[in-house]
Amino acid sequence: MAGDVQILRRKGDNCCRDIKDIVNILMSRGFTNEFLSDHGDYYLFSVNKPGYDDDGRWYLDDASSWAVMYVHIIKDGFSIYTVEDASGQKTDYYRYIYIEGYGDRAFMYLNFLHEYFKLFPDDIFSGAADYLYTKEDIDRIYEKEIWSEIWHCLDPKTL
């Protein structure tokens, strides 16, 4: 199942300094070839793997070997989502990373998100069906023994 998804950031400091951390996460997962192109208000970032290693957990049930991400370094003029917490306080979230063609790379990206949220716990992930996932949701899904390959299309409360 293909679909584009995104990581949303609530603070307005989208900047290129975090790209280094994103690259480091992907490199630690076996991606060694990357391409970064500056488009002014966002970077087009793509990576791929040169080979396959069956010993790595991130390869289980996921035959993907490339990823395309658009990293927005300038905050959009309007928020993508406004989230209301239990106390009624509303928080605006802005697009930070747009991930192209999530689909059959669900486990690879779950692994990426698990590491990403260790560094940026206040960001949220917007799945293919516009469900919002917090760091806690991603951690819970990641730790499951059995998980659905379409987890990013399902309500995180049901997972």
Language model features: what each stretch is:
Residues 40-60:
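Accessory recognition modules or surfaces
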Residues 11-15, 51, 77, 103-105:
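Residues that cap or initiate secondary-structure elements
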Residues 56-159:
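Charged interaction segments
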Residues 1-46:
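Short, extreme N-terminal segment that most often corresponds to the first beta-strand
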